[in-house]
C-alpha cells in the first residue's frame, strides 16, 4: 500500500510536519542534569494524597537539579471534567507551596503551550499522520460487535486477549476498501500497527525498582478515537516529547504500560524520558474473622473509604502545609528523618531527594506519626506565625474563630501563648488548627 497516499486520505487538512513541531518546541536550554518534570492530572476537582505525594517528588527533583516543573491538564475525557477543576488543582498545590514554573495559568511562559490536551489536537494528528506515512498506523473500522467476536475467539483458543497479529483484521484492508468505507461515512479509529512480536522482551532499569524485564508490546492500540481525540498513551508520548520532559514520576500501576510507551517513543523518533514508578500510599486495615480473630492487611488509601485519602481533608483539619510535606518526605526517603535531626535549622528545600532511597513497596500512611510531625513543626512557629496561619485557616473553615481573631487580636494572641508555652518551655500539644 502507498502509505503516503493513505495518510493524505485520512488527514487531508493536516499540512504541518513533525519537523515544524520540533522547531516550534525547541529543546530547553538548561544545565546538564536538569530534570524537566510534570504533574498531569485530569480536572476532576478531587486530589488524592497520592497525587500530592507525586507532585512533591516531581517538583523536588526538578528544583534540586535546576530544572523545570510544569502542570499539564489531561482533559480529553470531558465527561469527567469539573467546572473550575484546573483552578482547584492549582489552588490546592499552591496551598502546599508546590507551585509550577509553567502551566495553563496567567503569567506562565508560553513557548511549550498549550498545556491542556484538549487544545493540542492538531499536534497529535500531525504525529499520527507521520506514523501512517511510515506504515505504523492505520484506520480501523472494526465495530464493537466485531471486537466482541474477536475476544470470544481468543477466549476459546486460550490466547492473549487483544487486537493484534491475525486478530487485527483492520490491518488487511486495501486502500480501495478504506476509501469505500470513508465514502459510506463509517466511523473509524486510528490504531498503531505494532511491530512487536510474541516472545520478545524489553528490559528496563527503574531508578526505584531496579532492573525489570517485560514482554514487548504487540497490541495495535488505539491512537486516535473516532472523534479525533488521542488516547492517553499516545497523547502522553507526544506531550512529554514536545514539552521536553525528561523525567516522569508516576504510580506503579503504570509499570505495565512501559513496553507500549517505549515502543511509541521509538516509532515516533522521540527520545524516551526516564520513568520512575512510585509505590502507592497504603493503610493498615484490621479485619475480624468469624472466630473473632483479628487480621491485619495493607490496602491502598481509598477515595471511597478513607477521608484522609483526599488532600482537602488536611486543609479542613488545619494541618500546616509544612507538616504534611515534612511527613510525606519521611515516606519518600528513608534517610530524611536522620538528615532532619542533624539539620534542625533547615527545611525540606535543603534536602536532596534520592529516587534510589524511595520505597519499592507501598509505604504505610500513619496518622499518629503525621500528628507527631505536625506538633513538632508547629512548636517551631513563632506566635505571630501561628496567628497568621490560624487566621488563614479559620477564614475558610471556622467562622467564629476567625471573628474572634480579627476583632480582638491581643486576646487571641494570649490564647496562643497559653497552649504554646509552659514557662520558658515550648509545648507540643497542638498538631492542627482545629485542635
PLM ranges: what are they?
Residues 78, 115, 248-250, 311-314:
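Second-shell loop/turn segments in exported
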Residues 130, 137-301, 310:
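Active-site cores that bind ATP or allylic diphosphates and position pyrophosphate for catalysis
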Amino acid at each position: 500500500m502507498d502509505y503516503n497516499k493513505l495518510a493524505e486520505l485520512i488527514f487531508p487538512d493536516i499540512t504541518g510536519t513533525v519537523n515544524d513541531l520540533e522547531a516550534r518546541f525547541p529543546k530547553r536550554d538548561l544545565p546538564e542534569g536538569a530534570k524537566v518534570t510534570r504533574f498531569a492530572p485530569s480536572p476532576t476537582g478531587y486530589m488524592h494524597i497520592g497525587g500530592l505525594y507525586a507532585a512533591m517528588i516531581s517538583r523536588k527533583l526538578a528544583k534540586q537539579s535546576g530544572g523545570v516543573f510544569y502542570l499539564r491538564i489531561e482533559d480529553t475525557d470531558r465527561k469527567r471534567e469539573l467546572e473550575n477543576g484546573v483552578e482547584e488543582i492549582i489552588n490546592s498545590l499552591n496551598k502546599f507551596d508546590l507551585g509550577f514554573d509553567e502551566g495553563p495559568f496567567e503569567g506562565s511562559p508560553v513557548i511549550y503551550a498549550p498545556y491542556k490536551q484538549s487544545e493540542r489536537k492538531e499536534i497529535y494528528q500531525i504525529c499520527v499522520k507521520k506514523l501512517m506515512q511510515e506504515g505504523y498506523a492505520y484506520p480501523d473500522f472494526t465495530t464493537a460487535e466485531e471486537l466482541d467476536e474477536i475476544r470470544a475467539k481468543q477466549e476459546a483458543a486460550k490466547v492473549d486477549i487483544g487486537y493484534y497479529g491475525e486478530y487485527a483484521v483492520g490491518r488487511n484492508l486495501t486502500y480501495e476498501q478504506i476509501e469505500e468505507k470513508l465514502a459510506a461515512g463509517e466511523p473509524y479509529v486510528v490504531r498503531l500497527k505494532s511491530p512487536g512480536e510474541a516472545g520478545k522482551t524489553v528490559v528496563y532499569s527503574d531508578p526505584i525498582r531496579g532492573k525489570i524485564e517485560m514482554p514487548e508490546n504487540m497490541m495495535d492500540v488505539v491512537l486516535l478515537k473516532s472523534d479525533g481525540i488521542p488516547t492517553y498513551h499516545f497523547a502522553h508520548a507526544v506531550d512529554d516529547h514536545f514539552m521536553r520532559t525528561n523525567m516522569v514520576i508516576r504510580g506503579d500501576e503504570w509499570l505495565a504500560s512501559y513496553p507500549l510507551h517505549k515502543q511509541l517513543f521509538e516509532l515516533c523518533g522521540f527520545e524516551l524520558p526516564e520513568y520512575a514508578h512510585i509505590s502507592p500510599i497504603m493503610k493498615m486495615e484490621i479485619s475480624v474473622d468469624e472466630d473473632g480473630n483479628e487480621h491485619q492487611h495493607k490496602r491502598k488509601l481509598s477515595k471511597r473509604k478513607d477521608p484522609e485519602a483526599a488532600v482537602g481533608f488536611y486543609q479542613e483539619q488545619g494541618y500546616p502545609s509544612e507538616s504534611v510535606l515534612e511527613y510525606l518526605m519521611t515516606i519518600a526517603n528513608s534517610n530524611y528523618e536522620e538528615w532532619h535531626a542533624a539539620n534542625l535549622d533547615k527545611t525540606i528545600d535543603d534536602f536532596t531527594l534520592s529516587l534510589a532511597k524511595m520505597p519499592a513497596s507501598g509505604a504505610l500512611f500513619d496518622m499518629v506519626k503525621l500528628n507527631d510531625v505536625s506538633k513538632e513543626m508547629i512548636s517551631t512557629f513563632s506566635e505571630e506565625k501561628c496567628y497568621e496561619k490560624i487566621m488563614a485557616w479559620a477564614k475558610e473553615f471556622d467562622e467564629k474563630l476567625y471573628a474572634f481573631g480579627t476583632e480582638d487580636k491581643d486576646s487571641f494572641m494570649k490564647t496562643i501563648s497559653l497552649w504554646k508555652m509552659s514557662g520558658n518551655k515550648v509545648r507540643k500539644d497542638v498538631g492542627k488548627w482545629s485542635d
